[in-house]
Curated annotation (Swiss-Prot):
Biological process, per Gene Ontology: coumarin biosynthetic process; ethylene biosynthetic process; response to molecule of fungal origin
Alphabetical list of PANTHER family matching this protein: OXOGLUTARATE/IRON-DEPENDENT DIOXYGENASE
Domain Fe2OG dioxygenase: residue ranges: 153-253
Keywords for this protein: Ethylene biosynthesis, Iron, Metal-binding, Oxidoreductase, Vitamin C
Lineage: Eukaryota, Viridiplantae, Streptophyta, Embryophyta, Tracheophyta
Metal-binding is among the record's keywords: yes
Molecular-function GO terms, alphabetical: 1-aminocyclopropane-1-carboxylate oxidase activity; 2-oxoglutarate-dependent dioxygenase activity; L-ascorbic acid binding; metal ion binding
EC number(s) from the headed UniProt entry: 1.14.17.4
Enzyme class: oxidoreductase
Pathway of action: Alkene biosynthesis; ethylene biosynthesis via S-adenosyl-L-methionine; ethylene from S-adenosyl-L-methionine: step 2/2
Organism encoding this protein: Petunia hybrida (Petunia)
Reaction(s) the record says it catalyses: 1-aminocyclopropane-1-carboxylate + L-ascorbate + O2 = ethene + L-dehydroascorbate + hydrogen cyanide + CO2 + 2 H2O
Protein name: 1-aminocyclopropane-1-carboxylate oxidase 1
Residues engaged in binding Fe cation: 177, 179, 234
Amino acid sequence: MENFPIISLDKVNGVERAATMEMIKDACENWGFFELVNHGIPREVMDTVEKMTKGHYKKCMEQRFKELVASKALEGVQAEVTDMDWESTFFLKHLPISNISEVPDLDEEYREVMRDFAKRLEKLAEELLDLLCENLGLEKGYLKNAFYGSKGPNFGTKVSNYPPCPKPDLIKGLRAHTDAGGIILLFQDDKVSGLQLLKDGQWIDVPPMRHSIVVNLGDQLEVITNGKYKSVMHRVIAQKDGARMSLASFYNPGSDAVIYPAPALVEKEAEENKQVYPKFVFDDYMKLYAGLKFQAKEPRFEAMKAMETDVKMDPIATV
């Protein structure tokens, strides 16, 4: 079995740039996932985020989760649970408008820490998109512009905690799915594992590493690259021992962004008679995804293709 791709991002600025770009290319084409070290976000920032996130769960969310488990009688289930996940979550919006000031129960210091962390993640996401452009032969800024819409991208963080689960064989931490959006940056617990991706028909563990950022590609990048890069099914396995923290930050297209395969890539694919992906408004895709998240992505693409005659093709905004 191949090793999960772990990439030292600082090497794109040195003599190992070509080899590092090739590693990113291979990860995008063959895994849909990779793990970044030396990515530029200071370790002390990540340590503070982790400490405050775990503290917030203990203080404000742990008891609510226990009450939910009791109300659903989840600890006594005898058959596989297919309609809910063993996770405690809340969501922070950063772009186009932040909701961090409005989210209840957050200490002011935690709000400031998360604002700072979000800015660093936004910068990293945009840096990665440009590296993907370079590997794809697209002009710098193409993917950011493709995501832009009229108000800029949507960017937010899903903050999750996965408490110890008494029946991990029957309840998933998070059921298998692909991510609907663009590029996802995950800061996960380095002590408790659980994240797995599907590759060549096998579930593979994503290794927990201290101070790393796990990157995965969403459905929109599969469409824009016309299938050259793929979004990949992944899931979280609940654990009997240990609580797992996960902060997944989604850098997604703006709600009114029109998503379609990059013409330069379609021309290359056309020569090989490969199928062209659909064109659609991102918000329309999200409405469809809401009811089909835990199903295969291909029927979603087919449904959008059936609707695409109604989509106006506007030129990509320039930022």
